[in-house]
């Protein structure tokens, strides 16, 4: 399983100050400490993950290496992004190469190449924007190649020297029993170069923190939590490696009228008790404008009316969802004396046929009597 980004583990931005890192780590350590979660394997793993992240980001040199090369820059067992397959092949390749005189397989002849880190960006949008789709401009914090040294990390006019530890290959070979294992060079972190006169603009890192502006197209029907991938718009690769990708995660603001459920929409429709009793025509809001529904006589609270096709056309759906209007019958307040007298007269007129006029009330009364009998 791939390791999570250390900044993501601690829940901080990539330009977080030391005190922010420490505060975030202490919070996680307190929450997931094994003494507070005895027998909880998941909490134990999260505690170890937070500890590992802080050990790297809390150290200035390790953090600089991590910012430039990712996990490979701080993992002595990394094989420059080749994965388990590459390390296994190199180990056996050396053995058979020594026996049969074959050449070494893999990328040991030059600096280690790393893919750029992926970036995440949370974008908050309205329900209307999600339904209709739109194009917007975003500013994404990212590490970019330094304009002064063009990513070399060396002061202009100087040249990085070949790493003395690995001879410029970016990797060293360690003998482990019968096997010769290739590892990322601990001195140059895979670059194959040593910087003796660092660039003053980036302190020798080769990268600077900045915001880059991008245009992002949000498709119609997108839902909360979905991600849009923008290929190649992540952080730049190292030593000619490919750039990472940008993932824009969508968060939809709460709407004052509608609640979304997949491609369907729900809303509460409050009506006066007179309309509920007598029926009538009502206008209801939809994302596309207004629609009319007929309220039949004797409508009760909780009744649901379905308007077909008035929901949202999802990203993968060929047709739109529906709109469900849930009726809430409103009881009048602050009545005048005259209005109260009218209602009392109305109440008295129901005494002879209460069961007929209020069947649900009669049913409820019968159930209560049965409960206490």
From Swiss-Prot:
Q: Chaperone as a keyword?
A: yes
Repeat region (CXXCXGXG motif), residues:
146-153, 163-170, 185-192, 199-206
Question: What are the residue boundaries of the J domain, all occurrences included?
Answer: 5-70
Q: What is its main location?
A: cytoplasm
Intracellular or extracellular location(s): Cytoplasm
Cofactor, how bound (note): Binds 2 Zn(2+) ions per monomer.
**Among the entry's GO cellular component annotations, what is one?**
cytoplasm
| Residue positions binding Zn(2+) 1 | 146, 149, 199, 202
Q: Which residues bind Zn(2+) 2?
A: 163, 166, 185, 188
ZnF locations on chain (CR-type)? 133-211
A single GO molecular-function term is: heat shock protein binding
The record's comment about this protein's domains reads: The J domain is necessary and sufficient to stimulate DnaK ATPase activity. Zinc center 1 plays an important role in the autonomous, DnaK-independent chaperone activity of DnaJ. Zinc center 2 is essential for interaction with DnaK and for DnaJ activity.
Q: What does this protein do?
A: Participates actively in the response to hyperosmotic and heat shock by preventing the aggregation of stress-denatured proteins and by disaggregating proteins, also in an autonomous, DnaK-independent fashion. Unfolded proteins bind initially to DnaJ; upon interaction with the DnaJ-bound protein, DnaK hydrolyzes its bound ATP, resulting in the formation of a stable complex. GrpE releases ADP from DnaK; ATP binding to DnaK triggers the release of the substrate protein, thus completing the reaction cycle.
The Swiss-Prot or TrEMBL record describes its family as follows: Belongs to the DnaJ family.
Give the protein's recorded name: Chaperone protein DnaJ
* Origin species: Bordetella avium (strain 197N)
């Amino acid at each position: 399983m791939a390791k999570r980004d250390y900044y993501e583990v601690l829940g901080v931005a990539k330009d977080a100050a030391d005190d922010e890192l420490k505060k975030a780590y202490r919070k996680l350590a307190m929450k997931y400490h094994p003494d507070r979660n005895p027998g909880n394997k998941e909490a134990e793993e999260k505690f170890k993950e937070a500890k590992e992240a802080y050990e790297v980001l809390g150290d200035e040199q390790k953090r600089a290496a991590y910012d430039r090369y990712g996990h490979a820059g701080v993992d002595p067992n990394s094989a420059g992004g080749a994965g388990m397959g590459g390390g296994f092949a190199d180990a056996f390749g050396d053995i058979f190469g020594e026996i049969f005189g074959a050449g070494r397989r893999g990328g040991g002849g030059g600096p280690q190449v790393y893919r750029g880190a992926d970036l995440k960006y949370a974008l908050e949008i309205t329900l209307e924007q999600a339904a209709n789709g739109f194009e917007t401009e975003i500013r994404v914090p990212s590490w970019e190649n330094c304009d002064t040294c063009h990513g070399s990390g060396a002061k202009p006019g100087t040249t990085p020297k070949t790493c003395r530890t690995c001879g410029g290959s970016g990797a060293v070979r360690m003998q482990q029993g019968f096997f010769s294992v290739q590892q990322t060079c601990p001195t140059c972190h895979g670059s194959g170069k040593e910087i003796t006169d660092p660039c003053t603009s980036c302190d020798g890192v080769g990268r600077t923190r900045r915001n880059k502006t991008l245009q992002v197209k949000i498709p119609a029907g997108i839902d909360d939590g979905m991600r849009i991938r923008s290929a190649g718009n992540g952080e730049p690769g190292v030593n000619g490696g490919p750039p990472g990708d940008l993932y824009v995660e969508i968060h939809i603001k709460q709407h004052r009228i509608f609640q979304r459920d997949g491609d369907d929409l729900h809303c509460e429709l409050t009506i006066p008790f007179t309309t509920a009793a007598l029926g009538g025509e009502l206008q209801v809001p939809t994302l596309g404008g207004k629609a009319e529904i007929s309220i039949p006589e004797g409508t009760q609270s909780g009744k649901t009316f379905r308007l077909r096709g008035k929901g949202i056309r999802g990203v993968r759906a060929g047709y739109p969802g529906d709109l469900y209007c849930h009726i809430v019958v409103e009881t009048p307040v602050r009545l005048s004396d005259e209005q109260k007298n009218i209602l009392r007269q109305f109440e008295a007129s129901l005494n002879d046929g209460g069961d007929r006029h209020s069947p649900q009330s009669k049913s409820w009364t019968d159930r209560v009597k049965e409960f206490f009998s």
